[in-house]
Amino acid sequence: MDKYNNYSNVIKNKSSISPLLAAAAKIEPEITVLSSASKSNRSQYSQSLADTLLGLGYRSIFDIAKVSRQRFIKRHDESLLGNGAVIFDKAVSMANQVLQKYRKNRLEKSNSPLVPQTSSSTDASSESQTNKLPEYNQLFPEPWDNFCRPGAIEALDSPASYLLDLYKFIQSVELDGSNQARKLETRRADIPKLSLDNDALYKEVTALSIVNDVLSGSAREYIDQSGQADKAVNQILGDTHFPFTLPYSLPTQQINKGLGASNIELGTVIQRVDPQFSWNTTQEKYNQVLLAYTQLSSEQIALLSLPDVFTQNFLTQTELSAGYLSASTTEILAEKDLSRHGYIVKAADNIKGPTQLVEHSDASYDVIELTCTNQAKETITVKLRGENIITYQRTKARMVPFDNSSPFSRQLKLTFVAEDNPSLGNLDKGPYFANMDIYAAEWVRENVSSETMVSRPFLTMTYRIAIAKAGASLEELQPEADAFFINNFGLSAEDSSQLVKLVAFGDQTGSKAEEIESLLSCGENLPIVSPNVIFANPIFGSYFNDEPFPAPYHFGGVYINAHQRNAMTIIRAEGGREIQSLSNFRLERLNRFIRLQRWLDLPSHQLDLLLTSVMQADADNSQQEITEPVLKSLGLFRHLNLQYKITPEIFSSWLYQLTPFAVSGEIAFFDRIFNREQLFDQPFILDGGSFTYLDAKGSDAKSVKQLCAGLNISAVTFQFIAPLVQSALGLEAGTLVRSFEVVSSLYRLVSIPQTFGLSTEDGLILMNILTDEMGYLAKQPAFDDKQTQDKDFLSIILKMEALSAWLTKNNLTPASLALLLGVTRLAVVPTNNMVTFFKGIANGLSENVCLTTDDFQRQELEGADWWTLLSTNQVIDDMGLVLDIHPVWGKSDEEMLMEKIQSIGVSNDNNTLSIIVQILIQAKNAQENLLSQTISAEYGVERSVVPLQLRWLGSNVYSVLNQVLNNTPTDISSIVPKLSELTYSLLIYTQLINSLKLNKEFIFLRLTQPNWLGLTQPKLSTQLSLPEIYLITCYQDWVVNANKNEDSIHEYLEFANIKKTEAEKTLVDNSEKCAELLAEILAWDAGEILKAASLLGLNPPQATNVFEIDWIRRLQTLSEKTMISTEYLWQMGDLTENSEFSLKEGVGEAVMAALKAQGDSDNV
């Protein structure tokens, strides 16, 4: 049977063939054109062509007409002995004639109403009926019998018909394919099994979901066969590194995309879900937040931070015997004078060698001893000679002595000498390996004030030494190479040599040629340098430099070239364009860099600047690896870039320096800041010269003006920050230098506060609050594992962001906050106004205010000496002042006094006790009114608040009046310190009360129930703490946004804090009732509140103070903004790079469900 026959039972009986088809198959011998194959076997010609057509599945001429002429001939011409074209043409001709006849018959039938009628038509003449013309609906009547119900599956325009026709069309196309073609049933095995039900036909689904289902099914089959059937498809995609679109984490994408639709980040969610937000957050939590801000999955982070497989230099014994010579290191840093530098060994257990530079040495080389280890952990010791090679070009003048101070190229030379290794012996058990790091180090002062010179590395060169017998294969020398290249580039180690070709590299990495040029900083992306910078390294101004400046290892390609010479570039070779200076080590860096660039969506030169600047701040990262501090810095950058549009150039200048470099066609960032406009006759040039910033005239004053113009600050602000920079850099008093360090410090001090909407002065005040160091930002940041969160630059920036936003929300300023916290203290200078103030209080304490014995001379009080009794029991003092009555929540002063009087036990007569209480209350009110009126008039605070204000600052009405009476000043010199301190405290607390609009109800709650606020240290003092001020603002914000009034809030707190015995706790659980009450106040779901309290670990699960309720309100805000439940927000707050895949998967699905609930189906 022919492969094109789709029928299951072939009709072989000739009598069943259509007569017309038989006629079409009738070919006259004289017009038959036989093929060469037919001529060799003429017996086949006698076979009936009609039987052949039947065998091919054609029973009528219409079956042939359904197929195109070209396809019919291609399929059957050979089977029909070369008559395919003739038979097709005859069949189509006959089919057209039959169709025409059919249409003519239908037209004749449709004209039947025109025939003259003989019944009941006598009113119409026969002539008019005969001459009547046909109408359109008569000529073209609707074929109602062929119609079906609109929307029915069997309709011609239904999805089922379209799908069926499409499916048949694909089958017909596949018939023309070769036997090796992948047919639809192979590519989409689900389609033949698809049930044409209502869901399949009418339910709208995205093309992406179909693609995902198909690909997941295919991937599942492959995974099941690879022995990883226990892992989900998405988990495998995260563990796979090739192609370069992987690793892919669906949960991470869901979380980032879902939260992004609500304009929020995962790091922000983690911050707000943390109960300690935001002043007491631990360093571990900040690390979690910063890594979350990268928006990278744990698999992506793992790929970036994996230990290096290769070293910068792989040296075999043969290469060392010939003498290895490194690239020159003098040209590495443009901003440093490297005329005097050398090479030292990084100390390690398996290495012995020089670890410090030596000023003068008579030895021509140093010996480095390496302990090399084979696969069986057996060791040998190898000695290498290390030399500092200088390339010096003499001038043509004779008798010019060698000048060791001139700039010249320096290179490290390593040599294996057989005489130094007589015991090396047999290497059959090899190869033996050893890793070694060598520093290029410069001479520097130990610190800014020391004369002691020490070695400070500025470049790390990594080596892997392989000692093996002659003829060792590459697989033996680099056994780890094959797995690396297969996993990351899809090639074996042997085939990896193809990556040097530009086309092959682009194919394996998914990069275009122009993208590779940008990556390598070549072609149209060459680095350029500002013309307004004179670099400290003198080699670039001499004839000793044999390379263009700047080079890619200075800017644009620093990371991928490991900050070393012989930078990669594109050259033309016989086989096409190639990448020069490519190595396994650089391929490993390119592997990380290309992926990271796509994940962060940054141009290559900007990402390189970002990475290398961060690495400069990473003190223990001389090898320039992507470490955890680097990743955290990238997270902070991505957050600031998203929220504040901070560019890589700005962020890099914060961590290191303003860059003087750019790529072709752009302006260096340094010039964009300080030379963007021609305001002066000459541009601002970094020439390394010093200037006095205190001068008002001359060239030094011009430098100050240029700096002020570039930073967009006033001269007053500059004079405020200049001493901070001078102190941080150890410069002479009143002096700065036109250098990268100085301008970068000034830029940090100005730009970081501006990012968060603060002035420079306010930013420094805020930094002083956070770090206890005003000039913290003047110093270049340095990451150190020993740093606490109080000194960690990245954490401090996050704190500064949160603190500035909180201050703005509550109408506070950094200056006022510093005063409230006591960080900044104003000088208290006694004045005549103070004397008048205290004299007024003393003079007001007349007999109408102070109690006397006469006040108790009443008939109702006879029988007891109440003056003596009250004085003895510390209710009043000898001067008639009522002693302090400590307030209690829920009790009035009258009740407190009554309890005090009753405790004396003199009389049980309620009438007598009531009279005593009334006398005392009148006196107490008079004394409070006197002091309140005076303080209110002087400080502008509400009179009713004054008694509570005095108690809050650690004093009380009685204490103040007593001090005034005993120490009434007569002049400025007689004002005692306690009274001066009182005026200062009153000023500070008045500022807090007025700024936050605090009423006496809140202050009374603060004094009597500090635990309801959540204060861990409720002690009253003249100095406020940041947690207390923060909780006060939380309370105020709660009151303003509550669904109930402040009394309801107090009632809830009172109910939630009812103390119970253990037996009562067992019998009665008020948690649900508390959740319901709080739900009414917050206008939120009680179940969510109860769940939040349980997640917080409260026992019983009920919020009892403002600290806990503020945390619940933060969850409420997040939940309402994102439509994510409390439980999943809590899980989101626990997400780290080490979290289980199942946890991330659950959170990702919850985020997508919440996004769909918001009606955003496009992003689901």
UniProtKB/Swiss-Prot annotation:
Disulfide bonds: none annotated. Residues 118-130 have a biased composition (Low complexity). One of its GO terms (cellular component) is extracellular region. It is found in: Secreted. Residues 106-131 are annotated as: Disordered. Its main location: secreted. It comes from the Bacteria. Keywords: Secreted, Virulence. Disruption phenotype: Cells with a disrupted yenA1-yenA2-chi2-yenB-yenC1-yenC2 locus are no longer pathogenic in C.zealandica larvae. Toxin complex is secreted when grown at 25 degrees Celsius or less; at higher temperatures the proteins are present intracellularly but not secreted. Part of an orally active toxin complex (TC) with strong insecticidal effects on larvae of the Coleoptera Costelytra zealandica, Acrossidius tasmania and Adoryphorus couloni and some Lepidoptera larvae. The TC has an endochitinase activity. Semipurified toxin complex consists of at least YenA1, YenA2, YenB, YenC1, YenC2, Chi1 and Chi2. The Yen-TC:K9 subcomplex is about 26 nm tall and 22 nm in diameter with 5-fold symmetry and 5 copies of YenA1, YenA2, Chi1 and Chi2; the chitinase subunits may be solvent accessible on the exterior the complex. The Yen-TC:K9 subcomplex has no insecticidal activity. The native complex with additional YenB, YenC1 and YenC2 subunits is 16 nm taller and is insecticidal; the toxicity-conferring subunits are present at about 1 copy each. This is Toxin subunit YenA1. The lineage of its organism: Bacteria, Pseudomonadati, Pseudomonadota, Gammaproteobacteria, Enterobacterales.
